[in-house]
Amino acid sequence: MLADVFEKIMGD
């Protein structure tokens, strides 16, 4: 979901 994508771009 969207949250997963944000976590990937954040890296942590």
UniProtKB/Swiss-Prot annotation:
This is Insulinotropic peptide 2. Expressed by the skin glands. The keyword Secreted applies. Signal peptide: none annotated. GO terms for cellular component: extracellular region. Possesses weak insulin-releasing activity. The keyword Secreted applies. It comes from the Eukaryota. Keywords: Secreted. It is found in: Secreted. It comes from Agalychnis spurrelli. Its main location: secreted.
